[in-house]
Amino acid sequence: MLKTEELQINIGPQHPSTHGVFRMLVTVDGETLVDLKPVFGYLHRNHEQLGEVNTYLQNMPFTDRLDYFNSMVNNHAYARAVETLAGVEVPERAQYIRVIMDELSRILNHATAMGFMLGDMGAWQTALLWGMREREKILDMFEYVSGARMMCNYCRFGGVVRDIDDWFITELKKLMQGLPHYFDDFEGLLLNSEILLARARNIGVLPKELALAYSVTGPVLRGSGVAYDIRKAEPYAVYDRFKFKVPVGTVGDVYDRFLVRIAEMRESYKILEQAIEQLPDATGGFINPKVKQQSLKAPAGEAYARVESPKGELGFYLVSDGSGSAYRYKVRAPSFINLSSLADMCKGYSIADVVVILGSIDIVMGEVDR
């Protein structure tokens, strides 16, 4: 009788498929994966401890460095937590501006994430280059309003640092004219791709029950058939004024997570259309002038605020002792939580599938390790 022996191998911490310094200790029997242990910590930067030393405002640019693809969303979530804690009101126009930036970030994130995932599958780079083309247009707009392409540091307590003007609105409308063609081309090229179907269908299945048990969120949860989106379940900013759907999958495999992200880009487009149409004039201002940004002190208490980031639920938990810094500062990072389900997604599949499954979760190590 033929006997096989299990073998332990390391993938990472420096490996092109891990998209950052992340190590997987993998146990295989032949080419079949038996066990997987994720090893974190290579990018630890003491983020939460620094958040308890910095003033509230000083901590804003540090949030840019969590999910560095989505600094606008990070800023929004942190600003909401401080505003909740300090009882700060946000002008209506600023709420709309934040939503516009968040939805542009969602399109940017999903376009590049799916491009990278197809590269991991051994497909081609065309999809990634298409995504990068749209990403460049969005980053140019971010640079115009914030002065930076990626580390935007754009939100302030009670609003945003700079208003959007006619040029921005014109460029946004130009971008949106081309987005439907990009979505159609992307879908038409890829959904019938033999490489995508072979490498994604019935691979990395995460059943609904396991998804809920692991508390995963975002496209990973919705890909498993759970129609949960914070923008619908607990509307913040002005999301309750927009009509949009929550796309879900049926199987919970890599392919479903791919489809959910494509559908979410279309829903973000719908939200942007409505936001432009409803955007209030500049009369109410883009920031609350009563807020003392540099010397802000929150009354003693605690607050938790969350947003639907492109990767899932991004939350900030703050405890105040009445001083100008947080007594306790905690980040609920979706990449970290979603990554906890990786082992169950991978068991029983080929070691070659691990790279694809990891890519379908869409992690950024900046918010995994912190």
From Swiss-Prot:
Pfam families according to UniProt: Complex1_49kDa
Enzyme class: translocase
Single GO term (MF): quinone binding
UniProt superkingdom: Bacteria
Cellular component terms (Gene Ontology): plasma membrane
Entry's localization field: Cell membrane
Reactions listed under catalytic activity: a quinone + NADH + 5 H(+)(in) = a quinol + NAD(+) + 4 H(+)(out)
EC numbers for this chain: 7.1.1.-
Matching SUPFAM superfamilies: HydB/Nqo4-like (SSF56762)
Membrane topology note: Peripheral membrane protein
Keyword Plastid included in the entry's annotation: no
Keywords recorded for this protein, A-Z: Cell membrane, Membrane, NAD, Quinone, Translocase, Transport, Ubiquinone
InterPro entries: NADH_Q_OxRdtase_suD, NDH1_su_D/H, NiFe-Hase_large
Main location: membrane
Physiological role: NDH-1 shuttles electrons from NADH, via FMN and iron-sulfur (Fe-S) centers, to quinones in the respiratory chain. The immediate electron acceptor for the enzyme in this species is believed to be ubiquinone. Couples the redox reaction to proton translocation (for every two electrons transferred, four hydrogen ions are translocated across the cytoplasmic membrane), and thus conserves the redox energy in a proton gradient.
Family statement drawn from the similarity comment of this UniProt entry: Belongs to the complex I 49 kDa subunit family.
Quaternary data: NDH-1 is composed of 14 different subunits. Subunits NuoB, C, D, E, F, and G constitute the peripheral sector of the complex.
Official protein name in the record: NADH-quinone oxidoreductase subunit D 2
Taxonomic path: Bacteria, Bacillati, Chloroflexota, Chloroflexia, Herpetosiphonales
Gene name of the record: nuoD2
